[in-house]
UniProtKB/Swiss-Prot annotation:
An annotated Gene Ontology molecular function: catalytic activity, acting on a protein
SUPFAM superfamilies from the UniProt entry: Class II aaRS ABD-related, Class II aaRS and biotin synthetases
The family this protein is said to belong to: Belongs to the class-II aminoacyl-tRNA synthetase family.
Descriptive protein name: Histidine--tRNA ligase
Superkingdom of origin: Bacteria
Residue ranges of coiled coil: none
Organism: Clostridium perfringens (strain 13 / Type A)
First-listed, main subcellular location of the protein, grouped into a coarse class: cytoplasm
Keywords: Aminoacyl-tRNA synthetase, ATP-binding, Cytoplasm, Ligase, Nucleotide-binding, Protein biosynthesis
Underlying gene: hisS
GO biological process: histidyl-tRNA aminoacylation
Catalytic activity: tRNA(His) + L-histidine + ATP = L-histidyl-tRNA(His) + AMP + diphosphate + H(+)
Enzyme Commission (EC) number: 6.1.1.21
Amino acid sequence: MAIQAQKGTKDMLPNDAYKWHYIEEKLRKISAEYGIREIRTPMFEATELFKRGVGETTDVVQKEMYTFEDKGGRSITLKPEGTAPAVRAFIENSLYADAQPTKMFYFTPCFRYEKMQKGRLREFHQYGIEVFGSQEASIDAEILSLVMRALTEDFGIKGLSLNINSLGCPKCRAKFNEALKQYLKENYDNLCETCKTRFEKNPMRIIDCKEKRCKEIVKEAPSILDYICEECSDHFSKLKAYLDVMGIEYNIDPQIVRGLDYYSKTVFEVIKDGLTVCGGGRYDYLVEEVDGPKTPAMGFGLGLERLLLILDEEGIEIPEPVRCEVYIGSMGDRARLEAMKLAFNLRKSGIKAEIDHLGKSVKAQMKYANKIGAKYTFVIGDSEIEENKIKIKRMSDGEQFEVSLDINEIVNIVK
């Protein structure tokens, strides 16, 4: 049996690559508009980073990570998300010593051993933004404005819902956890086994459980918004005011807690037809948790596979770039030498050029040129070389132009 791609992974083939380039280019552009610069972190990190950063009781750490021991006996994990590695890089490279805030974006593969679903694989790709050094609600609103602008204006997606919540700070969250435990006590026996372990350690994680029975139980659970302190409430009010002034519509959803333990205050999700397109929030204590200086932060992740799926389902076309601008057909060895020289010089002039490498007949060469969408074609043979003339054919309408074999003349026609 032939070796195949592993379950939950997918090849990105040449016919699809341009779609990825398109969305990445759009996201790079809007990142630059907000003064956000790129960071790239390693594919794997010390397992301890995710245990401490993401949270021991999360599904990600308990069930979904690809963890192995390397030859030096170190526990290594393929990164399941992009925030913790960005935090590690922020601390290790002393970026906190630079002028703040520090704004960074990334494109990264992530790995989670989870049940596959629509738009989600075990190896998936994320666009993420992390902003360090500001505790103001204005930065939260700024990032949310970027997200909604990118999705609605740059990509033209309709029917999106921006849902927001506040998880408060450790002080007000402790009060909420007690109220939540009181509520859950009477349904404790009906919780899944994982949530029973969470009941004492981290009851708020139960709200994020994917098990149907647990989802039913938490439907009537207390709202954390009834327990947040004055400072956190003020922060949330400012966030809403900033969104209002920018004309960004939102819904308040007290059941958004996100699947990772590091979030505090603002959390959000962008939903389309019941699926989360992207999500994130504030994590004011994570930098400190992984041995960095006290640093407030905010970020999010956007799944690129899911974004491409939505664009396809919405019928939003991604423009396919021209693959070949000029196809140079040739007859015989002498003509092939001339074709090679011309193609080389056309490419130097920034023109996409192709020649025959299979010794095909002229008819077969022209058929191939048509298949790859060549905009112009011409054929070189002995007579063309002797007369120093060729006829360039514009494929869109069949019009022909007679020019010399001079590279500048050819460029003037096809450029």
